[in-house]
Amino acid sequence: MQPQPHISPNTATAAISAALESQRSRKNRGSYNCGRCGQPKKGHVCLLTAPPDIPTTPIASEPVSCISAAASSSRSTVLSLTAAPSSRQTFTHLRRALSFDDVDARNSLDESDLDAASMDLDLQLDTDIVQPGRFHAVGLWEVLKRLPPSSLLMAARVCKGWRETSRKMWKAAEELRIRVPERAQIGYIGSLLQKCPRLIRLSLKIESDFDATTLACIAFSCPNLEVLEITTSGAAVNRISGDELSRFVANKRGLTSLKMEGCSNLGGFSLSSSSLSTLWLSDLHSLSKMIFNCPNLTEISLEFSRQEDDSTDLVTMVDGLGRTCTRLQNIHIASLKLSHTVVLSLTAVNFRYLRMLSLVLGINITDASVAAISSGYKNLELLDLSGSSITDTGLGMICDVLPDTLSKLLVALCPNITSSGIQFATAQLPLLELMDCGMTVSDPNSDNPTFVENPSPHKTPGYNQKMFIKHKRLKKLSLWGCSSLDALFLNCPELMDLNLNLCSNLHPESLVLQCPKLQLVYASGCQGLLTGAIRKQVSENFSAGENHMPRKRLADASKRIQALPSLYQETREDGIYAGKRRKLEKEMCTIIH
C-alpha cells in the first residue's frame, strides 16, 4: 500500500472556507467541460471511457470507519474518517485493561483490496457534479475522509456534489469519536448519530454533565452498536444510575465492549448480557450491589474512588464474578479496600483462564496474599501489585512459581521492596519484558523528592542503594521516584524505554548503560550532569555497535566485501559511502528532562 499524504485538518478547513466564500460571490452554473477528456460539452460526444483506476461510480470499500488513536496511522488526527479494512481482514485492537504496551496497529489494507471492496457499496457519485475545484469523486473522497466531523459538516455546504459525498460518507461510517463541548445540547449528539446508521463503534468525550438521556439517544440512533466508550473531561459529572445502565446493557444485545468513566452515582447495578466481553468502570463508590450475569465476559476493570468511606463489599463482588463470569482472562481492581481476605476469595474462585491480574492500591495485601496468588494461578503473564505491602520475600515467591510465564511485573509504590529484591526478580524471570519499580527504593523521609544539585557525600548507609540488572529480554524499565538509588548498572540489549524521573541521588559517574536499542529515557528531576552522561553513553553504545571494518568491491564491482586492514587500503570513495550508510543506520535516543 502506497503511503497516503497527510492532509492537515486545518489546511483542509481553510480550503473549504475559501470555497464557501467563492460560492457566495458567484453563481455556480456547473462545469462547461467534459469530465473525462476536458473538451467543451457543447456539441461534444465523448468517446473516452472512464480509466480503470478512477471509476465513474466510486468508491468506498466497506463502510468507512473512524479509526481510533490506538489503531490509526502516523496521523493522529482526532475523529478522522478513514477507509475500513475489508471483510477478509478484521482488526479488533481493543486495548486490554491490563496491557501496558503501546498499541501501534496499522491498517494493512492494500489498494487491490480497496478496489475489490469498492463495489460492495454503491455511492452513486458523479464526477461531473463535484464542484468547485473539479475533483473526481475519488479525489474528493480522499480529501473529505481526513476531516474531523465538524469540518465535514462545513464541507457539505460547499455545493451539491460535496453535500452528496459527505452524506454518503456519514452513512457509511462504522466508527465515530466525538468531543462534546461544554455548551452542547443533547441534540448535538443525536444529530450526528442519526447520520450514521451503520455505526458500530462510538467514543464520546463529554465536557458537561450528562445523564440517562445520552444513553437513550445512543440506543435509539445506533441499533448495531458493539463498542461504546464514554470519558469525562474537566468538571463533567456522570449522573447515570445503576438501574439505567443495567437497562441499557440489557437492551443492547449486540454490545461487546463498554467503557465508562465517572460512575460515582451508580449506587448499585445488575448487568446481564450474553454478548458483553469487555467492561471498564471507573470512579465507583459505595455500591450496594454488583451483579454480573455476563457468561462471555473476558476482561473487567473496576476502579474505585480513593475515599476511606467506601463501603463496597469486594468479597461478595468477587464471589459473584466467580459464579457467573468463569471465562475471565484479565482482572483489574483498584481500591483502598483490597485486603488479604479479598485475595483469598479470588483464589478460591479459581478462574481457569486468568492470565493478567492487577490488584492496585491494596495496602493490606502482604506476602501471605502473594503466596495465595502463586498457589492458585500459575500461568499469569502479568501481575500488578502496585501500592501493596509485599516485601522481597513476596517477590521470591513470584519468581519461584511464575518463571516460565510472567512477562510483566509491576510493583510500584511498594515501600518494603529493596534493590536486592528487584535484582533477584530480574535474574529469576527470563521472560520479563516490562518491570515497574517506581517509588520502591526511595527515601522514607522525603515525601516529595526534589532535585539536589550538590548532594552530600555523607548519606545514611541504609538509604544509598545500588542496582545491577542484566537481562536479555527486558524492554521497559521504570525506576521513577527511586531517590535512594545512587548507582545503576544496566546490561539489557533489548531495553528501549527507561524511566529515571526523580532519581535525585543517582550520580553520573555511577551510571552505566549497556543498552544499544535504547530509544526513550525520562530523566526529569535528576541531577543536571546526569542527562549529559546518559546522552554520552547512549552515543557510545551506538558507535560500538557499528561495523568499522573496511570494505572492498569484487573485481566486477558488483558487491562489497570485508577486507583485512593489511590487504586493503580504504579509498576516499569507500569512506564516503560507508559514512552515509552509518548515518542512515544510526538511531537516535530521546531524553526527556
Curated annotation (Swiss-Prot):
Residue ranges of LRR repeats: 178-206, 207-232, 237-262, 276-304, 335-361, 362-387, 414-439, 477-502, 503-525
A GO term from the CC aspect: nucleus
SMART domains in UniProt: LRR_CC
Nucleus as UniProt keyword: yes
InterPro entries: F-box-like_dom_sf, F-box_dom, F-box_LRR-repeat, Leu-rich_rpt_Cys-con_subtyp, LRR_dom_sf
A GO biological-process term: seed development
Domain F-box: 120-177
Phenotype of the disrupted gene, per the record: Stabilization of KRP6 and inhibition of germ cell cycle progression leading to male sterility.
Entry keywords, A to Z: Cell cycle, Developmental protein, Leucine-rich repeat, Nucleus, Repeat, Ubl conjugation pathway
Tissues expressing the protein: Expressed in developing pollen.
Gene3D superfamilies given in the database record: Ribonuclease Inhibitor (3.80.10.10)
Location of this chain's protein in the cell: Nucleus
Pathway participation: Protein modification; protein ubiquitination
Nucleus listed as a keyword: yes
PANTHER family: MITOCHONDRIAL ATP SYNTHASE COUPLING FACTOR B, OS12G0601000 PROTEIN
Record note on domains: The F-box is necessary for the interaction with ASK proteins.
Protein function: Essential protein for male fertility. Component of the SCF(ASK-cullin-F-box) E3 ubiquitin ligase complex SCF(FBL17), which mediates the ubiquitination and subsequent proteasomal degradation of target proteins. Enables the switch in cell cycle control leading to male germ cell lineage formation from microspores after meiosis. Targets CDKA-1 inhibitors the degradation specifically in male germ cells (e.g. KRP6 and KRP7) and thus enables CDKA-1 activation and germ cell S-phase progression. Promotes twin sperm cell production and double fertilization.
Known partners and oligomeric status: Part of a SCF (ASK-cullin-F-box) protein ligase complex. Interacts with SKP1A/ASK1, KRP4, KRP6 and KRP7.
Protein name: F-box/LRR-repeat protein 17
UniProt source species: Arabidopsis thaliana (Mouse-ear cress)
